[in-house]
Amino acid sequence: MNEIITARGSLLIAGVTIDGATVDIAVDEKGTIAAIGKDAKKTIDADIVIDGSDRIAVPGLVNTHTHAAMSLLRGYADDMILQDWLSQKIWPLEAHLTGDDVYAGTRFACLEMIKSGTVAFNDMYFFMDRAAAAVDDMGMRATLAYGFIDLGMEEKREAEIKATETLVAHVRSLDNPRIRVAVGPHSVYTVSPEGLRWCAEYAAEQEIGIHVHLSETEKEVVDCVARFGKRPAYLLDDCGCLTPRTVAAHCCWLDEAECRLLAERGVTASHNPASNMKLAVNRAMPYHWLKAAGANVSLGTDGCSSNNNLDLMEEMKFAALLQKFAWNSPTLLPAGEAIEMATAAGARALGTGPGTLTVGAPADIVLLDARAVCNTPLFHADSNAVYACNGGAVMTVLCQGRVLMHEREVPGEEEIVREAAAAARSLVDRAQDSS
């Protein structure tokens, strides 16, 4: 195994490129960036030295909407209408999930994210105690939420409340600064107003975040207005779910007033362009309205079953192109803003630091291959990162100063892939046997 990955202590990335300049990055033993510049090496006696020549340093990427264990469902069901896809394929299969499946799937998802430059993610799913174990093993950051779905039934709501409280207690017992917890009301169409209010009150009481799907489809909006007399964002607001700790995924069918409301409440909107296009939700997130209102807009992949990968490098390109095409504006969401969505905006949403390569920030650092075909010629690094490269250009990944991947080597990769493949096959077999 690569000894740079197994070593611990202070670290120096020597001769790396940042914004066109060749510098060193010094990382102290706490995993914090101690210095950046030509004299950075003088600030520490480095235990680990990484050769940064022919490498471009960028902040670690932050994926603000995932269902990580759904990596086991990659390619299981495609090219379907969203509600049919969920009700006929995804939900029936998920009924057979076990904690071991979620561990294997989440560990596999972490591997894929690391290999494409992601250091932190915002996850909503089930058996999240096992997801936490996978995140811990892989060395990433994550905010984990149990997917709260009560379907308007009081008995089910009580069970969801208990499951949420159990996860919060479990994550706090881990005392792991890389792993945080949130409340996860799935959506306005799967959670009753009573359930939404409980989620909001509990999140406020515990001082934790809220992770929710919002206005993904036109049907969600139409049904909400028909049932409650108001659009989904206003229903969430009435229930107390729109706060500065809230990440709202999708936001495709927001109107301009709802965009202003999210900005006023300090909500982060998570753009998931690949999933939205694949599921044909028929409208791109109104990024221009959200930005004009001052909202924080971040980037997510959604789950592997609707993307079908977790490559946030690729997602940046999808975001930029979709916005330009859908809103007929070639200047909308330029490359620099796409990178900011995938880094600093996501870090703000999850509270993982500034999401920048600056002194005092957590050493969440990605090194891209400057010699890769996608980076040749290298006129503008931001442009290449967004429009030309994908996760294959990622060579080295650090999270809080710990090397998770070096020269594309991740410890235990073959075993992780093998176990995920076996878990996926077993899950499908169990579902078929029961039908």
What residue ranges belong to the model's regions?
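Metal-coordinating catalytic core of metallo-dependent amide/deamination hydrolases
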Residues: 130-252, 257-259
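Histidine/acidic-residue-rich catalytic or RNA/ligand-binding cores of hydrolases
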Residues: 218-230, 258-263, 280-290, 307-324, ...
